[in-house]
Regions:
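Extended, alpha-helix-rich binding/interface surfaces that flank or overlap catalytic cores
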Residues: 1-55, 61-144
C-alpha cells in the first residue's frame, strides 16, 4: 500500500468516527506517544505540530472535553516550537530527538512543559472518563 493510499485510509477511518470518538482517538494517539519521556514528549509534539490537520484535531479534542489546562499546554508547546523555528509542515521536517539535548534553552523550556504535562494529565484522564460516562451515546452504540 502506497503512502498516499495509507493516508487516505486513515483519513476515511477518522472521518467515520463521531465527534466524541475523534476527540478520544486524538487524545489516545498523542498521549500514548508523549507520556514515555521528555524526549518523546518533545519529538511527538513537534511531529504533530508539523501536520496542521492533526494539530488542529488535537486542539479540538481538548476543546471538546473542556480541558483548558491541556489546551493551554498545547498552545505553550506550539509557541515554544515556533520560537525555535520548528517546521509547521512535514515537507521541511528534519527534527531529531537529539536536537532537544543540543539546545539548552529548548531543553529547559520543554522540561518545564513536560512537568506541567505530568502534573495535569491525571486530571485530564479523569475529566475524559467522567465526560464519557455522562455522554456514552457519543462514544458507543448500544444495540437493543
Amino acid at each position: 500500500m502506497s503512502e498516499e493510499t495509507n493516508i487516505g485510509v486513515k483519513e476515511r477511518f477518522y472521518e467515520e468516527l463521531t465527534e466524541g470518538q475523534r476527540a478520544l482517538f486524538m487524545f489516545h494517539v498523542y498521549y500514548n506517544h508523549i507520556n514515555k519521556s521528555l524526549i518523546e514528549f518533545y519529538w511527538w509534539s513537534a511531529y504533530f505540530m508539523a501536520q496542521s490537520k492533526k494539530w488542529a484535531a488535537l486542539k479540538a479534542c481538548f476543546k471538546y472535553f473542556n480541558d483548558e489546562s491541556f489546551l493551554l499546554l498545547l498552545e505553550n508547546i506550539e509557541q515554544e516550537l515556533k520560537q525555535h523555528n520548528h517546521p509547521t509542515t512535514l515537507e521541511n521536517f528534519t527534527i531529531t530527538r537529539d536536537e532537544l539535548n543540543q539546545n539548552k534553552e529548548l531543553h529547559a523550556s520543554f522540561e518545564s512543559l513536560y512537568a506541567i504535562f505530568e502534573n495535569i494529565y491525571p486530571a485530564t484522564i479523569e475529566k475524559i472518563n467522567i465526560f464519557i460516562e455522562k455522554n456514552l451515546q457519543d462514544f458507543i452504540q448500544i444495540e437493543k
